[in-house]
Amino acid sequence: MNYIILFHTNSSALKFAKFLKNSDYVGELIPLPRKLTSSCGMGIKLQFTGGLSAVISEEIEKIYAVQGDQYELVYRAEE
């Protein structure tokens, strides 16, 4: 399954990208689609088949599952 991960800050996205390089996860830093945010920002496109709890951290704001050109919100951080 493909996911797009949104973060509270761009620096958190960069930090997570560095984490990915040192892990077995497949992902890349991307500019966020306008459908998902009104602000300019970076996020992570992640290809992942396990339980999302393995990648969730306090820096993650939202996670969307990607199905073609559709996005389904599957995780939102508590406010």
Over which residues does each language-model region extend?
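Amphipathic, hydrophobic secondary-structure cores in small proteins
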Residues: M1, K21, V26-I44
